[in-house]
Amino acid sequence: MKYSDKVFGLRGLIQGIEDKRLRPQIAMEEIFGAGLVMALGQLGSLNALEQIKKQCYWKRWLGADLASADTLGRGFSRMNTDSIRKTIRHVYSRLKRNKVLRPAYAGMIALIIDGHESHRSQLRCCGGCLERRLHTKDGIRRENYHRHVMASLFCKGVCLPLDLEPQAPGEDEVSCAMRLLVRVLKDYPKAFNLILADGLYTQAPFFKLAKKHGKDVIAELKDDRRDLLKDAQGLFKQSKPNLYQDNKVERQCWDMEHFTSWEQLGCEVRVVCSIERKRVKRQKTKKIHFENSEWVWASTIPKQKLDTEDFVKFGHGRWKIENNGFNELVNYWHADHVYCHNPSAIEAFGLLTILAYILFHAFINRNLKAVIRHKYTKKHLAQMITAE
């Protein structure tokens, strides 16, 4: 907390958090400040936070007693989420100014867009729940669930979450992602050069939105764009691949531009194919095993901006949001926990988790010496923060 207050002016940022209550009895800065301690300590629930209510720490940090779990939940349900986004933008700008965020490859930083299902239930629902029907042995059952789309920066050595957008009932993931992308392009216009997405986003409206704002896209190419895929595969068979070695992975890459088979997009497309052979040593048998895979991407970025080798690295970089983003946020930061089953509260707690994640990684990467970072795991460091 002291580091975050010194570098980012955390106390002042917390005082700027707004809410929709008319006559609040407890200040929003007390509610958000308590939630931030819970998130940074990776406690995982408001009830766990309430267990340490009698600690003298709260008087020093909040200047007041800790509110109850129910009060904190109601407070987050009335919180102005745009004010949390403003706080995240301020922290990002400080990191950028301090040259913490460095390009991943070819002098570029990429924005990764992907969707995630945070939780589901067959018993509880709210106004923001999506609905689906499950065919079970006991008949058809209704299941409610929540999904959101997250935007993260892919920089050298770090995947930094920036924002999220809840998917509304009756809305598909790409429409939700486009709404998120419009806001990210407005809030972080110069933060990234390139957008990475999976095969679901290989749609003309998404590509056109990115091109309209001067951003190129790399997305997986699947059977949904069969004409483009067939044209590319036919030409690839007539040419020799470029060979690359990336640690234990051998790659045969084909890279061609000026495809016009995607008529809905209305511009030329670049297609890259990578057939890969990875050398794996089995832990049990100690034998060497080879895993083969094939990847195809469609993109609007020309070769003169991004060569084939770095293109493929960015294409695989999309998985950073799965491995270093959703995986860590869910398993260590309890991002899938329902603190309060209210659409506004779920969004607010999601943004709170993003803010805590950024502050925690800024602290361990910028304030701790390398020998400490290498000696202890992130989980252990988080537990030390909680103990203090």
Question: What kind of feature is each model-predicted range?
Answer:
Residues 23-92, 203, 210:
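Short, positively charged, Gly/Tyr-enriched micro-motifs
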Residues 1-33:
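Basic, short loop/linker segments at the boundary and entry of helix-turn-helix/winged-helix-like folds
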Residues 11, 244-260, 330-388:
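A short, flexible helix-boundary coil/loop motif
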Residues 2-3, 49, 305-340:
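Short amphipathic alpha-helical "interface-anchor" segments enriched in bulky aromatics
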